[in-house]
Amino acid sequence: MKPVWQKYIEIINQVVKPALGCTEPIAAAYGAAVAVQELGCSVPDSLEVFVSDNLYKNSMGVFVPGTGKIGLAIAAASGAIGGNADAGLEVLAAITPEQVLQAQEMIDAGKVSVKRTVTDEFIYCCVIAKFEGRESLVKICGGHTLIVEKQLNGKINFIADESSATSTGSICEGVDINIASIYEFATQVELEKIAFILQAADLNTKLSDEGMTNSYGLEVGRTMKKSIDEGILSNDLLNKIVMETAAASDARMGGATLPAMSNLGSGNQGIAATIPVVIAAKHYKNSDEQLARALILSHLGAIYIKSHYPPLSAFCGNTVTSAAAAMAMVYLAGGSFEQSCFAIQNVISDSSGMVCDGAKASCAMKVSTSSCAAVRAFLMAMNSRSVSGQGIIAKDVEQTIINIGQMISHGMPSTDTTIINIMSA
């Protein structure tokens, strides 16, 4: 096995992992759980939560799993009272109704405050917990569970080494990686080295089934199913992919108590990287090995493309995640590497203008839009049709990825500020 392939496996294991609930409010829940653990109490006297603008934006409209409620305050209070500080992104997996009630009582009593803070970091959350005159501080920065500092009664007892950072940009820094090397790795590495990725199919399919069975959010998936049953839509590959991908997002954003296999801290993007690939594999009757290789293509491809821009921004990351999924679908359909590159080009050309205006129920619509673009792009690619040398789409896929990264990093910060100001008005 090539030495760099082991690094690829490490990257995937590091940032493709189960997450219960939207990861921005979950970061606050996790920080609060750790802060209370440091204090050694069960219910703190008070909580103060300071977050970056982007983390604030992505927590304003999304349900916190197990609570039936929205926002950072309930996330932090629930994490403090019923969170498992050792469970990372699944910190609220065992939350009980009684603990949620206690959390709400804390909020109603004015014991939980949430404030935006000025920081250059996109992912930033600082939680201060107080109990009987003692105080703990936990600072998360650069990743949703990346604790960079802990204090107890004003004394620093932990500071992370700079090398521990796992933010989007740093995850691929210094690694010899590109679309061609990802394709070679995914299609040639020994199966036993990557079979673990099949857990993504299991977790995200269960979430999709939940969204199809029960009512969550806007019911994008269930609405499509109703239209299929009524003969308005056909039950074809395109609509199956869009329907089942959207259903998983419905459930996730609606507070379902099932984890998603996330991708670089995003459950929706983990869903977008997984469900279209799973449905395509069923359609083409691919083997489990082919599915595993396709999921590696999709997840690692998405990680690589997203390494070119900030982890949270005004750009909806489901677009480029779906580009990676389209590449994987080409592989499942027996297409070539060149056609896989065509698929990426086509998706980015199609839907790269979609903005992120916070995590919420309507994210399921954006997930459905992106997955639809992925199928369309994949079908065009299989017919060797590709956008090339137009707009931000270069003739070379690697340059296109650089271009989209530049557009987001340099062209969209003011858009992000405007969106946050509108949402906060």
From Swiss-Prot:
InterPro entries: Ser_deHydtase-like_asu, UPF0597. Pfam families: SDH_alpha (PF03313). GO terms for biological process: L-cysteine catabolic process to pyruvate. Disulfide bonds: none annotated. It comes from the Bacteria. GO terms for molecular function: L-cysteine desulfhydrase activity. Transmembrane segments: none annotated. Signal peptide: none annotated. The lineage of its organism: Bacteria, Pseudomonadati, Pseudomonadota, Gammaproteobacteria, Alteromonadales. Belongs to the UPF0597 family. This is UPF0597 protein Swoo_4889.
